[in-house]
């Protein structure tokens, strides 16, 4: 089946149809229409898979996809234009330009945590740049994945875009085929496998991964607003967000006050019993719940931690000053557990931060510009928010992506178009007479020419 779909898509791409801007816009408009048609079903599926509140599903999934489609439709023609480039003195009389062109057949493997948004946003970029797409959504969010297939089937012909459902064996099988581009969102561990498979065929790829995202809080901040924004970013989608604050590094002078404010904001957001809150999500499955429970077993100073396996529920949990060698401080948590670690000075801070790889996200709460600038200059990361969390993801004019262990490449808006485009460099020369120095035999004395060129 997979071979047949790939052959169809290859033939369709070679027909040049996808290179038409009008075709791309028409395709995306049809997708937008069907998303709006099935919007309530999308909410229902996200509720079944992750217990997402309808408002959260709209703001963090559906709205972002619709916004991305509209942004592409508005800008495709401009982005696709041939771009004139200033000629070099060495290419006298030439016309230099760059032509963006689609790669061809693209494979997208998407995760379960934001199953609608993270499946569709990369697809929009690929289609908008003129590629064909095969999408493999996660089997861990089955209701949403099945609905995505239904929406895609009503929006595109199979030879243009197709969704293939299945488990990790299907994903492995797909990776054995030759692609012109691979886009993967998921764990660093699986990302390395994808990179290895792509390297065997010299296939370009983007990896959107994760990491331990630090959240630094210094003593200058207003604690009420700081706690509110941290709680929102950490416990959104039950902590299952790749850019969620993974742990807090707080100045020891305000540790107890911040913890009290965080406890208060958790109760304000989700009530005294978050299990009864319609605004609090669920862990995706029992396997991940067991993993999260294992992080808590050896911790002594815990606030929260209640678990209900039947309901896939883990209470919003604070772990106070875990050891830096504990698993909870060495592994991306990806759940509603928030370690709070104290520091006394900038040296302490650097010692703790240096233990981790470059994260996907970085958060600093401070009014001290010098402190903020020092941190931003010293550490490398995918993206950051100052005095807030998550919001760097919302601006489609900013590239979104990691570095090193947290990812390779970036997307969103024009950055998605660039990701899924190859830029051909062209130099066109007229048949004017060339400078005689270009061709052999070369002069032994070229000091005059050398002096001129060295000044340019």
Identify what each model region corresponds to.
Residues 1-97:
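N-terminal Rossmann-like NAD(P)+-binding subdomain of aldehyde/semialdehyde dehydrogenases
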Residues 2, 21, 39, 223, ...:
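Residues at or immediately preceding the N-termini of alpha-helices
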Residues 13, 17, 32-35, 39, ...:
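Structural signal for hydrophobic packing residues in well-ordered secondary-structure cores
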Residues 20, 216, 314-456:
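Conserved C-terminal structural/oligomerization subdomain of aldehyde/semialdehyde dehydrogenase
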Residues 24, 69, 130, 161, ...:
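Residue-level signal for inorganic ion chemistry
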Residues 46, 145-148, 174, 194, ...:
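Hydrophobic packing residues within well-ordered alpha-helices of enzyme cores
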Residues 89-225:
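Rossmann-like NAD(P) dinucleotide-binding subdomain of oxidoreductase/dehydrogenase enzymes
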Residues 156, 189-324, 386, 448, ...:
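ALDH superfamily catalytic-core signature
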